[in-house]
């Protein structure tokens, strides 16, 4: 998908490719948070490069800085973690690709809103490789898919399901946290929360839409689309980042 100069986040000057890593297995959330904090600190200090870190988590809920307690509908269902990212409640679990995005926006563009738009563009371009039309909606951060086969909304408009969530944090213009795209998660767990504080809409995944996409398939698309929006990344391979220094 072609990107305009307004939505791309290519570095201003020649830079090393973004480090791109896939974590094997299920990553405990506490360890992921600690690693992100450490890596973001190192990027700010100039002792480490930018990084995109792909993980899956065991089933859990996270609460962003805007989370309302009333949106946690089933507090005893899964572990709940408070986190410093923006947004409200979301679910993470096996079959969902979480991409933690640790980029130095001083080297790109110091514009939070444009950065969120670029993350949405990245997801939309990734989904397009599987002929899925993902769309953004004003006032509903994330990526949405029209579901005309479902009952319409109360106002008669077409039902839409969320397929990807975005929740980021910036500290001195270095980003951490990131995006979560539903490849084949257990969608029933979303019923324990009001996802992202938005009621009245559904949640879907690539497999729920009838596409037998594997996580490996999606990772390839994710990397290709990332390079369209953010520039070059290292060759994709799997490693254990938690055993590496930041």
From Swiss-Prot:
Query: According to its UniProt record, which residues of this chain constitute the active site?
Result: 196
Name the Pfam families on file: LplA-B_cat
Residues given in the record as substrate binding sites: 85-92, 165-167, 178-180
Molecular function as annotated in GO: lipoyl(octanoyl) transferase activity
* Assigned GO CC terms: cytoplasm
Q: In which pathway does it act?
A: Protein modification; protein lipoylation via endogenous pathway; protein N(6)-(lipoyl)lysine from octanoyl-[acyl-carrier-protein]: step 1/2
Q: Which Gene Ontology terms describe the biological processes this protein takes part in?
A: protein modification process
Question: What protein family does this chain belong to?
Answer: Belongs to the LipB family.
- What miscellaneous comment appears in this entry? In the reaction, the free carboxyl group of octanoic acid is attached via an amide linkage to the epsilon-amino group of a specific lysine residue of lipoyl domains of lipoate-dependent enzymes.
Name of the protein in its database record: Octanoyltransferase
The upper taxonomy is: Bacteria, Pseudomonadati, Pseudomonadota, Alphaproteobacteria, Hyphomicrobiales
């Amino acid at each position: 998908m072609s990107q305009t100069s307004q939505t791309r986040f290519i570095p201003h000057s020649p830079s090393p490719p973004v480090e791109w890593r896939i974590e094997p297995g299920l990553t405990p959330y506490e360890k992921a948070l600690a690693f992100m904090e450490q890596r973001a600190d190192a990027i700010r200090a100039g002792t480490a490069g930018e990084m995109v870190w792909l993980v899956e988590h065991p089933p859990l809920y996270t609460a962003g800085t805007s989370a309302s307690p009333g949106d946690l509908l089933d507090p005893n269902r899964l572990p709940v973690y408070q986190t410093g990212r923006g947004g409200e409640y979301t679910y993470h679990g096996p079959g969902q690709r979480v991409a933690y995005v640790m980029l130095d926006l001083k080297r790109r563009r110091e514009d939070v809103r444009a950065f969120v738009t670029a993350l949405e563009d990245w997801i939309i371009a990734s989904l397009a490789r599987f002929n899925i039309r993902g769309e953004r909606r004003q006032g509903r951060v994330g990526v949405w898919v029209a579901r005309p086969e479902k009952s319409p909304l109360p106002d008669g408009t077409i039902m839409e399901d969320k397929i990807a969530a975005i929740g980021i944090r910036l500290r001195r213009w270095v980003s951490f946290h990131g995006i979560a795209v539903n490849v084949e998660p257990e969608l029933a767990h979303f019923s324990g929360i009001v996802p992202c504080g938005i009621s009245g809409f559904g949640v879907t995944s690539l497999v729920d839409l009838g596409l037998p996409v594997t996580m490996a398939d999606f990772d390839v698309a994710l990397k290709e689309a990332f390079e369209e929006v953010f520039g070059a990344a290292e060759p994709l391979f799997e490693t254990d980042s938690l055993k590496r220094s930041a």
